[in-house]
């Protein structure tokens, strides 16, 4: 039976994640908490808007209402990555070789592996940024589509158009597809080799959480009374295919999803704080956490896939251990 270690905090959990074996919880009030031989805290920002672990898992990158982008080490030491004055850093992404991208207003910033900073201007507000899995390429979500840049090189960006507001963005692990979440309760995808559109609609609510399966064969999403999991096994992705619906409940919406690092099993967090795990192959479900305070806002597995860190909008955080 899974065991749950709880950490009751007082603010919305923006990101639950792992640095090595240490679970971290970045809260909207600017504090970052970790469970490392006891509960420890770092006050990183005066208001935190985004947080992601670096690709090597050694630092937690954070962006705040104070215009700062910081890197927190597992021992709590804080280093500065960038500062853009009195602007909100509302989007953040970790890239290869230590590259970092963030956004404020209509500008995306990329700190390259050699430490140089590139500024990329856009005609509309940048809502989200993402790095491609290979090569130094970033994608920006904006109104009416997405923009692709190679920030280390001079050259024209590639514009991908689709009407509406795009609020999240992610590359498939093989780099073949780009997917955005939209304001209008839908996902939109582009097949990058030929620009073909992929419509993934029918959600009753806005999608706020996306997670790729370990081999990139599935993309899980929130925004419905079940985790909606789209198939990406073929060269055309989910074009013309129905998604899996995992962990269906009649009384609560799915608010967060997180795929296991090795198995095609997805952790599903709900608006009432419950967490289930469901398997793609046979849709079998296991209860990981009973309902609690606040909607689940973020979840992340450790590298071994034995422990799941979670956080809620009410600051109800913790770690589920499934190994016992």
Enumerate the predicted regions with their spans.
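WD40-repeat beta-propeller superdomains and closely related acidic/aromatic-rich repeat-like regions
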Residues: 1-324
């Amino acid at each position: 039976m899974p065991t749950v270690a709880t950490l009751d905090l007082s603010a919305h959990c923006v990101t639950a994640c792992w640095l090595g074996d240490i679970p971290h919880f970045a809260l909207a009030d600017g504090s970052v908490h970790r469970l490392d031989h006891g509960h420890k805290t770092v006050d990183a920002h005066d208001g935190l808007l985004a947080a992601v672990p670096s690709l090597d898992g050694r630092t937690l990158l954070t962006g705040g209402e104070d215009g700062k982008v910081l890197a927190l080490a597992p021992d709590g030491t804080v280093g500065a990555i960038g500062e853009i004055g009195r602007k909100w850093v509302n989007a953040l992404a970790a890239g290869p070789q230590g590259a970092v991208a963030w956004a404020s207003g209509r500008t995306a910033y990329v700190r390259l592996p050699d430490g140089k900073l590139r500024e990329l201007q856009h005609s509309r507000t940048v809502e989200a940024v993402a790095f491609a899995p290979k090569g130094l390429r970033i994608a920006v979500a904006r109104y009416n589509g997405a923009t692709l840049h190679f920030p280390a090189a001079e050259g024209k960006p590639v514009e991908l158009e689709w009407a509406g507001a795009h609020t999240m963005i992610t590359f498939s692990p093989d780099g073949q597809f780009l997917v955005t979440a939209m304001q209008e309760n839908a996902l939109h995808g582009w097949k990058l080799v030929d620009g073909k559109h992929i419509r993934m609609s029918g959600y009753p609510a806005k999608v706020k959480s996306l997670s790729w399966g370990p081999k990139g064969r599935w993309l899980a999403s929130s925004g419905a009374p079940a985790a909606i999991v789209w198939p990406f096994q073929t060269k055309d992705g989910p074009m013309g295919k129905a998604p899996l619906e995992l962990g269906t409940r009649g009384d609560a919406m799915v608010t967060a999803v997180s795929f296991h690092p090795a198995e095609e099993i997805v952790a599903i967090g709900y608006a009432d704080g419950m967490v289930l795990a469901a398997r793609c192959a046979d849709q079998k479900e296991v209860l990981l956490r009973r309902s609690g305070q606040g909607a689940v806002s973020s979840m992340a597995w450790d590298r071994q896939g034995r422990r799941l860190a979670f956080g809620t909008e009410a600051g109800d955080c913790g770690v589920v251990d499934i190994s016992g």
